[in-house]
Amino acid sequence: MMYEADATSNESARPAGCLRVLVVDDAPDVTELLALMMSHAGYEVAMAFSAAEAFDAARAGRFDAVISDIGMPGMNGYQLAEALRALPGYERTPLIAVTGFTHQEDRERARRAGFDDFLHKPINPSDLLDAVRKLCG
């Protein structure tokens, strides 16, 4: 099930080209923390707790960026990125991987799947916001 997180009044901190962000992680506490980081920065945030749920949300609505875990049961983050890249309107949407995977091979696989950036957990809020701003700006 997808949930919306309220954006705060810090809209001046976000770039005009990136308003709606989808956050995806199978760990609800991580999903909620990432969504909180983004909403405090002024973004409108939707949350999904699986890659399949995120793909359904992307088909149903438009997101300006997607922040996704990689290691999820069922459809994983790599598969989600590939599916999103094949979805009309998502060919150039910024996709950011947030993961506990730390090897260079993981980073390379993420790029091949369609991710634009790759951040290691635990996530530093400023690193996440910088990545979103860089890709959306």
Model segments located where?
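Charged docking surfaces used in two-component/phosphorelay signaling
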Residues: E32-H40
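Short hydrophobic/Thr-rich beta-strand motif most characteristic of the beta2 strand and flanking loop
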Residues: G42-F49, A57, L119
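Active-site beta3 strand of CheY-like receiver
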Residues: R62-I67
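Receiver (REC) domain active-site loop signature in two-component systems and cognate sites
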Residues: M72, L84
